[in-house]
Protein backbone atom coordinates (compact mmCIF):
# COMPACT_ATOMS: atom_id res chain seq x y z
CA UNK A 1 0.00 0.00 0.00
CA UNK A 2 1.18 3.45 -0.83
CA UNK A 3 -0.16 6.91 -0.21
CA UNK A 4 0.70 10.15 -1.94
CA UNK A 5 -0.15 13.15 0.20
CA UNK A 6 0.08 16.90 -0.39
CA UNK A 7 -0.27 19.62 2.23
CA UNK A 8 -1.23 23.20 1.35
CA UNK A 9 0.60 25.45 3.80
CA UNK A 10 -0.44 28.73 2.23
CA UNK A 11 1.69 31.45 0.67
CA UNK A 12 4.62 32.72 2.74
CA UNK A 13 3.02 32.02 6.12
CA UNK A 14 5.46 33.40 8.73
CA UNK A 15 5.61 30.12 10.72
CA UNK A 16 6.32 28.12 7.56
CA UNK A 17 8.98 30.63 6.45
CA UNK A 18 10.65 30.45 9.88
CA UNK A 19 10.59 26.63 9.85
CA UNK A 20 12.15 26.57 6.37
CA UNK A 21 14.88 29.02 7.42
CA UNK A 22 15.61 26.98 10.57
CA UNK A 23 15.88 23.74 8.59
CA UNK A 24 18.09 25.35 5.93
CA UNK A 25 20.57 26.10 8.71
CA UNK A 26 20.48 22.48 9.94
CA UNK A 27 20.78 20.57 6.64
CA UNK A 28 24.10 19.20 5.46
CA UNK A 29 22.67 17.03 2.67
CA UNK A 30 19.12 15.99 1.91
CA UNK A 31 17.88 12.83 0.27
CA UNK A 32 15.43 10.24 1.51
CA UNK A 33 17.94 7.43 2.11
CA UNK A 34 20.31 9.66 4.11
CA UNK A 35 18.06 11.18 6.75
CA UNK A 36 20.04 12.22 9.82
CA UNK A 37 17.40 14.83 10.63
CA UNK A 38 15.34 14.48 13.78
CA UNK A 39 12.28 16.16 12.24
CA UNK A 40 12.22 13.78 9.25
CA UNK A 41 12.48 10.74 11.48
CA UNK A 42 9.87 12.05 13.95
CA UNK A 43 7.39 12.77 11.14
CA UNK A 44 7.99 9.36 9.55
CA UNK A 45 7.37 7.67 12.90
CA UNK A 46 4.14 9.64 13.39
CA UNK A 47 2.92 8.71 9.90
CA UNK A 48 3.76 5.04 10.50
CA UNK A 49 1.88 5.09 13.81
CA UNK A 50 -1.17 6.72 12.18
CA UNK A 51 -1.29 4.20 9.32
CA UNK A 52 -3.88 1.49 10.07
CA UNK A 53 -2.93 -2.17 10.06
CA UNK A 54 -0.68 -4.54 11.95
CA UNK A 55 2.27 -4.89 9.59
CA UNK A 56 5.75 -3.36 9.31
CA UNK A 57 5.59 0.19 7.95
CA UNK A 58 8.10 2.45 6.26
CA UNK A 59 7.77 6.08 5.25
CA UNK A 60 9.66 7.89 2.53
CA UNK A 61 9.24 11.64 2.12
CA UNK A 62 9.79 12.96 -1.41
CA UNK A 63 9.53 16.31 -3.11
CA UNK A 64 6.85 15.81 -5.76
CA UNK A 65 3.77 13.76 -6.49
CA UNK A 66 5.44 12.39 -9.63
CA UNK A 67 8.36 11.17 -7.53
CA UNK A 68 5.92 9.53 -5.10
CA UNK A 69 4.05 7.87 -7.98
CA UNK A 70 7.27 6.60 -9.61
CA UNK A 71 8.43 5.10 -6.32
CA UNK A 72 5.03 3.57 -5.54
CA UNK A 73 5.06 1.81 -8.92
CA UNK A 74 8.66 0.62 -8.43
CA UNK A 75 7.74 -0.74 -4.99
CA UNK A 76 4.62 -2.49 -6.34
CA UNK A 77 6.60 -4.05 -9.18
CA UNK A 78 9.40 -5.21 -6.88
CA UNK A 79 7.01 -6.57 -4.25
CA UNK A 80 4.75 -8.47 -6.67
CA UNK A 81 7.32 -9.45 -9.30
CA UNK A 82 4.78 -8.20 -11.85
CA UNK A 83 5.11 -5.25 -14.21
CA UNK A 84 1.65 -4.22 -15.43
CA UNK A 85 -0.19 -1.18 -14.07
CA UNK A 86 -3.79 -0.11 -14.57
CA UNK A 87 -4.60 3.59 -14.54
CA UNK A 88 -7.79 5.47 -15.39
CA UNK A 89 -9.08 7.94 -17.94
CA UNK A 90 -8.87 11.54 -16.76
CA UNK A 91 -6.06 10.73 -14.32
CA UNK A 92 -2.99 12.89 -13.81
CA UNK A 93 0.10 11.27 -12.30
CA UNK A 94 2.92 13.65 -13.17
CA UNK A 95 5.20 14.94 -15.88
CA UNK A 96 7.97 12.33 -15.67
CA UNK A 97 7.89 9.70 -18.42
CA UNK A 98 6.18 7.11 -16.22
CA UNK A 99 3.86 9.77 -14.80
CA UNK A 100 2.89 10.79 -18.34
CA UNK A 101 2.29 7.15 -19.31
CA UNK A 102 -0.01 6.72 -16.31
CA UNK A 103 -1.86 9.96 -17.05
CA UNK A 104 -5.20 9.33 -18.76
CA UNK A 105 -5.08 12.26 -21.16
CA UNK A 106 -2.99 12.73 -24.32
CA UNK A 107 -2.96 16.51 -24.80
CA UNK A 108 -1.13 18.35 -23.41
CA UNK A 109 0.81 15.71 -21.47
CA UNK A 110 1.80 12.91 -23.88
CA UNK A 111 1.48 14.52 -27.30
CA UNK A 112 4.81 14.72 -29.11
CA UNK A 113 6.83 12.69 -26.59
CA UNK A 114 6.99 9.43 -28.53
CA UNK A 115 6.62 5.96 -27.08
CA UNK A 116 5.53 5.63 -23.47
CA UNK A 117 6.71 2.92 -21.06
CA UNK A 118 5.02 -0.45 -21.74
CA UNK A 119 2.49 -2.38 -19.69
CA UNK A 120 0.40 0.62 -18.68
CA UNK A 121 -3.29 -0.03 -19.33
CA UNK A 122 -5.99 2.62 -19.09
CA UNK A 123 -9.55 1.88 -18.06
CA UNK A 124 -12.57 4.18 -17.92
CA UNK A 125 -13.08 6.16 -14.71
CA UNK A 126 -16.71 6.04 -13.54
CA UNK A 127 -17.96 9.50 -14.39
CA UNK A 128 -21.62 10.32 -14.98
CA UNK A 129 -20.64 13.51 -16.82
CA UNK A 130 -18.83 11.37 -19.41
CA UNK A 131 -21.58 8.75 -19.45
CA UNK A 132 -19.61 6.03 -17.65
CA UNK A 133 -21.40 4.30 -14.78
CA UNK A 134 -19.70 2.31 -12.03
CA UNK A 135 -21.10 -0.89 -13.53
CA UNK A 136 -19.75 0.01 -16.98
CA UNK A 137 -16.30 0.85 -15.60
CA UNK A 138 -16.15 -2.45 -13.68
CA UNK A 139 -17.48 -4.34 -16.71
CA UNK A 140 -14.72 -2.83 -18.85
CA UNK A 141 -12.10 -4.11 -16.39
CA UNK A 142 -13.63 -7.59 -16.44
CA UNK A 143 -13.58 -7.62 -20.26
CA UNK A 144 -10.02 -6.28 -20.23
CA UNK A 145 -8.92 -9.15 -17.99
CA UNK A 146 -10.77 -11.68 -20.16
CA UNK A 147 -9.48 -10.46 -23.52
CA UNK A 148 -6.37 -8.26 -23.35
CA UNK A 149 -4.58 -8.24 -20.00
CA UNK A 150 -3.55 -11.19 -17.86
CA UNK A 151 -4.49 -10.13 -14.32
CA UNK A 152 -1.51 -12.15 -13.05
CA UNK A 153 0.78 -9.55 -14.71
CA UNK A 154 -0.74 -6.56 -12.88
CA UNK A 155 1.45 -5.14 -10.11
CA UNK A 156 -0.82 -2.23 -9.20
CA UNK A 157 -3.96 -0.30 -9.88
CA UNK A 158 -3.33 3.41 -9.45
CA UNK A 159 -6.34 5.65 -8.92
CA UNK A 160 -6.97 9.13 -7.62
CA UNK A 161 -9.85 9.08 -5.12
CA UNK A 162 -10.56 12.60 -6.36
CA UNK A 163 -9.39 13.44 -9.86
CA UNK A 164 -8.24 17.04 -10.17
CA UNK A 165 -7.07 17.18 -13.79
CA UNK A 166 -9.99 15.02 -14.87
CA UNK A 167 -12.52 17.59 -13.66
CA UNK A 168 -12.67 17.15 -9.87
CA UNK A 169 -14.37 13.78 -10.15
CA UNK A 170 -14.85 11.75 -6.99
CA UNK A 171 -14.36 8.00 -7.29
CA UNK A 172 -17.48 6.30 -5.93
CA UNK A 173 -16.80 4.41 -2.69
CA UNK A 174 -18.43 1.22 -4.00
CA UNK A 175 -16.18 1.37 -7.09
CA UNK A 176 -13.07 1.67 -4.92
CA UNK A 177 -14.28 -1.23 -2.77
CA UNK A 178 -14.89 -3.36 -5.88
CA UNK A 179 -11.38 -2.59 -7.18
CA UNK A 180 -9.91 -3.70 -3.87
CA UNK A 181 -11.80 -7.00 -4.04
For each predicted feature, which ranges?
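Catalytic PLP-binding core of fold-type I/II PLP enzymes
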Residues: 151, 169-181
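Conserved PLP-anchoring active-site segment centered on the Schiff-base-forming lysine
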Residues: 78-94
Amino acid sequence: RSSDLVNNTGHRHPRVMAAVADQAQAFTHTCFHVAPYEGYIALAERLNAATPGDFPKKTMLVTTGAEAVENAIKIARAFTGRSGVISFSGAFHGRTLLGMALTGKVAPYKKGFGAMPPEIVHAPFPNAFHGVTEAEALGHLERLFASSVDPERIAAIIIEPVQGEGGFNIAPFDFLRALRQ
